[in-house]
Amino acid sequence: MAVKKFKPYTPSRRFMTVADFSEITKTEPEKSLVKPLKKTGGRNNQGRITVRFRGGGHKRLYRIIDFKRWDKVGIPAKVAAIEYDPNRSARIALLHYVDGEKRYIIAPDGLQVGQQVVAGPDAPIQVGNALPLRFIPVGTVVHAVELEPKKGAKLARAAGTSAQIQGREGDYVILRLPSGELRKVHGECYATVGAVGNADHKNIVLGKAGRSRWLGRRPHVRGAAMNPVDHPHGGGEGRAPRGRPPASPWGWQTKGLKTRKRRKPSSRFIIARRKK
């Protein structure tokens, strides 16, 4: 994938960049693998805002992605197409299994149309194949990693991300996650070989406010621009200082306060915390 630039014939075009979509081979999604996606506007079932600055955006269909490839062990599939997915930063690959089933997976970097992929402990170590972590050699780059066996892929799913196998310790495999965190994950957890494709996603510049609105993002208002009733930083005459340690809209200390529970059971699996 490459990034496409524009001549600055308007102010918003000056720095705007878009993906060139050269890797996309099919424009319409597979009908059997899509379902409606209802917008919430950041509201919960009571109609109250639970996530601020969400709303609007282009209508989307949800593409059903296979994050549990262990239920097709030993069944080869051919990569039929690489498609765009509006619901994630990565591209998706349409697989045609030899038993007739079709599924979407996250498209790893280097996956080609016509290539054959397979899942299972005996699968060869090549891009797009899924195996339990204990069967993957140390140093291999993987993505779509399960945190618990049979629970579906949770880690390293965004564009350009990957985890690397650093070593083994009993039943567990030590992974370096995209954040830099070193973590133990059970060896029976499945992962897919390779890094997620569309690595240039991080170089996309929206260029104008309207493009954020197309994505369903509303303006992010600073607390200092609000009234005192709306935010701890609000109020004052003109540009007033905060007058207190920085706080969230709900009064929690922010800017550096650790929010992870001290006695969280999964902490025993974290060898080294993420890099700041």
UniProtKB/Swiss-Prot annotation:
InterPro entries: NA-bd_OB-fold (IPR012340), Rib_uL2_dom2 (IPR014722), Ribosomal_uL2 (IPR002171), Ribosomal_uL2_bac/org-type (IPR005880), Ribosomal_uL2_C (IPR022669), Ribosomal_uL2_CS (IPR022671), Ribosomal_uL2_dom3 (IPR014726), Ribosomal_uL2_RNA-bd_dom (IPR022666)
Pfam families: Ribosomal_L2, Ribosomal_L2_C
GO cellular component: large ribosomal subunit
Location of the region described as Disordered in the Swiss-Prot/TrEMBL record: 223-276
Residue stretches of biased makeup (Basic residues): 257-276
Alphabetized UniProt keyword annotations: Ribonucleoprotein, Ribosomal protein, RNA-binding, rRNA-binding
One of the protein's GO biological processes: cytoplasmic translation
GO MF term (any one): transferase activity
Gene3D superfamilies named in the record: 2.30.30.30, Nucleic acid-binding proteins, Ribosomal protein L2, domain 3
Composition skew (Basic and acidic residues), residue ranges: 230-240
Assembly, per entry: Part of the 50S ribosomal subunit. Forms a bridge to the 30S subunit in the 70S ribosome.
Role this protein plays: One of the primary rRNA binding proteins. Required for association of the 30S and 50S subunits to form the 70S ribosome, for tRNA binding and peptide bond formation. It has been suggested to have peptidyltransferase activity; this is somewhat controversial. Makes several contacts with the 16S rRNA in the 70S ribosome.
Similarity-based family: Belongs to the universal ribosomal protein uL2 family.
Name by which UniProt lists this protein: Large ribosomal subunit protein uL2
